[in-house]
C-alpha cells in the first residue's frame, strides 16, 4: 500500500511598517519642542508559506527579519512563523508498528535464612547412623541365610542316598542339625586340648582323628575316620587328576 501524501495549506502573512519622524527645536527660552509625524501604510510585504498537513509533524520556529534603513519599525521587527515539517519520505514505506509486551515482574522474595550449623551436623550424623544400621542388618541377614542351612543340606543328601524313599520333618531336621553342631564343637575342643599337650599352635590330622575317637563311640568313630581320610585324599588329589 503506497503512503499517503500530506496535505498542503498556504498561509499569507502581511506586515505593516509605520514610519515616524521626530523633529526637535530649541527656543531661546531653553525649552525643547518635540514634533512627531507618522506616515502609515508606507510598505506592505506579503509573506506566503506553504504548510504541509500530516500526521507526524515537527514544529520549527523560523525568525524572519525585514530590515529597512529609511523606516523605524515599531517594536521588534520579527515575525515568528511555525512551519510543520513532515519527517517521513513520500516514497519510503511506513514501518509497521511493533507491539510492545508488558510483562509483570515477579515480586522479589525475601532471602532464605541459612540453616544453622548444628542442624546440618545433626542431619549428617543421623544419615551416618542409618547407613550403619542398614549395613548391620544386611550382615545379620547374610549370616542367617548362611547359617540357616548349616548341616541340613548335607544330612538330607546323605539320607536320600541311604534311604531315597524316606522323608523327614523340619523339626527332626533341626534336632539333627543341633546334634551335628554339638558334635563338631566337642571334636574341636578335644583337638585343641591335644594340640596344647603337644605344644603346637596348628591342628593336624592326628589331633582331629584322636578327637573323633574320643568323642564318638567304637564303630562310629572308625567309620568317621575312614570316611574323613578318604575325603581328604580325594580333595588333595583333585588337582593331579585334573591335569
From Swiss-Prot:
One of its GO terms (cellular component) is nucleus. It comes from Arabidopsis thaliana (Mouse-ear cress). Keywords: Acetylation, Chromosome, DNA-binding, Methylation, Nucleosome core, Nucleus. The modification N,N-dimethylalanine is found at residue 2. The modification N-methylalanine is found at residue 2. Residues 120-132 have a biased composition (Basic and acidic residues). The modification N,N,N-trimethylalanine is found at residue 2. Can be acetylated to form H2BK6ac. Residues 67-145 are annotated as: Disordered. It comes from the Eukaryota. Core component of nucleosome. Nucleosomes wrap and compact DNA into chromatin, limiting DNA accessibility to the cellular machineries which require DNA as a template. Histones thereby play a central role in transcription regulation, DNA repair, DNA replication and chromosomal stability. DNA accessibility is regulated via a complex set of post-translational modifications of histones, also called histone code, and nucleosome remodeling. The keyword Acetylation applies. Disulfide bonds: none annotated. Its main location: nucleus. One of its GO terms (molecular function) is protein heterodimerization activity. It is found in: Nucleus; Chromosome. Belongs to the histone H2B family. This is Histone H2B.2. The nucleosome is a histone octamer containing two molecules each of H2A, H2B, H3 and H4 assembled in one H3-H4 heterotetramer and two H2A-H2B heterodimers. The octamer wraps approximately 147 bp of DNA. The keyword Acetylation applies. Residues 133-142 have a biased composition (Basic residues).
